[in-house]
């Protein structure tokens, strides 16, 4: 069964000793470019830590180690392989990224004794990696990977004496970076607009300042012109008021001289008429 693109494969494998585990291989199928995640469960052991390993079978007697854990709850990785072990929960997780067709073959989940580093428990399975088709080579983002549901397959060989480990969540999101991936724009786009906004604010501030200076200059000139007109009107009015006494008021001496002149003229006229 070929898994759909963007969905990593999650397997639950129960490790146990014995020849029966060596004779059976769980068949797994995946597609090139995808990520394979295998969760190998085992019964909790004693106080001494037992290393966990992931190896690829080269022959009936040789298994090449790809990655090995070093201590509990610490991720170890080599190339495209990572491993994470949690002895308290009773499982360890192995991840293969960027699957290739040449990755097809037999693999082993193994537990090694701390004394002589020999294999104490193991499970064997066979992986088939098919070439990616045009329909599966689609762009993706980490958001798609998190939001999608991970398919789960349980591969537990039937045994009478095998003790089942406590159940744990069937889905563990494992970040991967497949080839030909296209990332969507993130928060970098708004950050790139910050200089543009700052430039607009500075330009608006400069224009506003220029308008204020221009308006202040016009207001000042207008006020000076109004003050100049008020000063000219006040000077003209004062001059008119000052000239009034000279044109409307005459002294008593002038009025007396004017009176005598008129009287003499009248008397002279009367004398002429009488002579005639």
Swiss-Prot record:
Residues 214-276 are cytoplasmic. SUPFAM superfamilies: Immunoglobulin. Glycans are attached at residue 180. Residues 22-120 form the Ig-like domain. InterPro entries: Ig-like_dom, Ig-like_dom_sf, Ig-like_fold, Ig_sub, Ig_V-set, Immune_rcpt_domain. Selectively expressed by activated NK cells and by in vitro cultured (i.e. activated) TCRg/d lymphoid cells. Keywords: Cell membrane, Disulfide bond, Glycoprotein, Immunoglobulin domain, Membrane, Receptor, Signal, Transmembrane, Transmembrane helix. Residues 138-156, 167-183 have a biased composition (Polar residues). One of its GO terms (cellular component) is cell surface. Disulfide bonds join 40-109, 55-63. Residues 22-192 are extracellular. The chain crosses the membrane at residues 193-213. CDD domains: IgV_pIgR_like. It is a single-pass type I membrane protein. GO terms for molecular function: signaling receptor activity; transmembrane signaling receptor activity. It holds the Pfam family V-set. It is found in: Cell membrane. Cytotoxicity-activating receptor that may contribute to the increased efficiency of activated natural killer (NK) cells to mediate tumor cell lysis. Interacts with TYROBP/DAP12. Interacts with KMT2E isoform NKp44L. PANTHER family: NATURAL CYTOTOXICITY TRIGGERING RECEPTOR 2 (PTHR16423:SF7), TREM-LIKE TRANSCRIPT PROTEIN (PTHR16423). This is Natural cytotoxicity triggering receptor 2. It comes from Homo sapiens (Human).
């Amino acid at each position: 069964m070929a898994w759909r693109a963007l969905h990593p494969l999650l397997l639950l494998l129960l490790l146990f000793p014995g020849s029966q585990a060596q004779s059976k291989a769980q068949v797994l199928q995946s597609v090139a470019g995808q990520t394979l995640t295998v969760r190998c469960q085992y019964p909790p052991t004693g106080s001494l830590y037992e290393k966990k390993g992931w190896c690829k079978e080269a022959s009936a007697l040789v298994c090449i180690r790809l990655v090995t854990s070093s201590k509990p709850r610490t991720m170890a990785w080599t190339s495209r392989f990572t491993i994470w072990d949690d002895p308290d929960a009773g499982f360890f997780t192995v991840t293969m990224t960027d699957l290739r067709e040449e990755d097809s073959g037999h693999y082993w989940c193994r537990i090694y004794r701390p004394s002589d580093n020999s294999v104490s428990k193991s499970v064997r399975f066979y992986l088939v990696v098919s070439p990616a088709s045009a329909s599966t080579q689609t762009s993706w983002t980490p958001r798609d990977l998190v939001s999608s549901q991970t398919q789960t397959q349980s591969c537990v060989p039937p045994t009478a004496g095998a003790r089942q480990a406590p159940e744990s969540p069937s889905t563990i999101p494992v970040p991967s970076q497949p080839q030909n991936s296209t990332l969507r724009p993130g928060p970098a786009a708004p950050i790139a607009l910050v200089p543009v906004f700052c430039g607009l604010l500075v330009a608006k501030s400069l224009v506003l300042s220029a308008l204020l200076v221009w308006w202040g200059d016009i207001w000042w000139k207008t006020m000076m012109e109004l003050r100049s007109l008020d000063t000219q009107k006040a000077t003209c009015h004062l001059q008119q008021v000052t000239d009034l006494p000279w044109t409307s008021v005459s002294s008593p001496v002038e009025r007396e001289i004017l009176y005598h002149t008129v009287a003499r003229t009248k008397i002279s006229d009367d004398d002429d008429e009488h002579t005639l």
